[in-house]
């Protein structure tokens, strides 16, 4: 999901760089090879161009609300057993955590699966086919979390390795905090 307007960030945050790479590209790398199909839903031409260059399918739109983004992403998902919503502004999400989410869903395919850190749920979120009609008919302004909350008893979680995986970038300050974290991690590796 790459359709945020970036109002708090002051622009298109998904093309802002972390460690010399656009935020969305970090997320695309983390999903590489894990899904039968990867579709990025965005309202940003620059994001669409990058996705095309990386060989990722894109739905470019000018809709206003989160439910529109979900509906557009769900349009061609008939025949899929699950869909996974991955936020494009979580550049430190790891392939390992996403793979754990997918393998957990293979063991229990009727549950909604989401990642968490120390019991606090976050994204990505994996939805089984029985939720698809609800996802396509979300109330105005609502996202997949609305469906997960409506079926709390069917939500399961998979722990991520570290809290930084679930940090999303909403403001320039958020990005600065992540840059500081990444530089400190790099310093720790090189010493």
Positions of predicted regions on the chain:
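Conserved N-terminal catalytic core of the sugar/cofactor nucleotidyltransferase
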Residues: 25-84
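Short aromatic/basic micro-patch
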Residues: 17, 92, 126, 157, ...
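Structural signal for short hydrophobic segments within the conserved structured cores
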Residues: 16, 39, 57-59, 156, ...
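Conserved beta-loop-beta/alpha segment of the NTase-like Rossmann-fold superfamily
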Residues: 65-136
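N-terminal glycine-rich phosphate-binding loop and ensuing alpha1 helix
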Residues: 1-43
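Conserved alpha/beta core of the MobA/IspD/sugar-nucleotide pyrophosphorylase nucleotidyltransferase superfamily
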Residues: 137-191
């Amino acid at each position: 999901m790459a359709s945020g307007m970036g109002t708090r960030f002051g622009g298109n945050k998904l093309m802002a760089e972390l460690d010399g790479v656009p935020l969305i590209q970090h997320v695309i790398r983390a999903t590489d090879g894990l899904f039968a199909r990867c579709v990025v839903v965005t309202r940003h031409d620059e994001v669409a161009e990058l996705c095309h260059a990386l060989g990722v399918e894109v739905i470019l739109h000018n809709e206003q609300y989160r439910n529109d983004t979900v509906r557009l992403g769900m349009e061609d998902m008939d025949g899929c057993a699950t869909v996974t919503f991955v936020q494009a502004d979580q550049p430190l999400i790891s392939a390992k955590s996403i793979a754990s989410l997918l393998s957990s869903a293979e063991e229990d395919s009727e549950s909604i699966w989401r990642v968490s850190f120390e019991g606090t749920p976050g994204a990505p979120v994996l939805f089984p086919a029985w939720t698809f009609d609800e996802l396509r008919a979300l109330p105005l302004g609502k996202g997949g979390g609305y469906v997960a909350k409506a079926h709390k008893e069917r939500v399961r979680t998979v722990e991520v390795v570290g809290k930084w995986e679930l940090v999303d970038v909403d403001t320039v300050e958020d990005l600065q905090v992540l840059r500081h974290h990444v530089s400190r991690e790099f310093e720790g590796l090189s010493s």
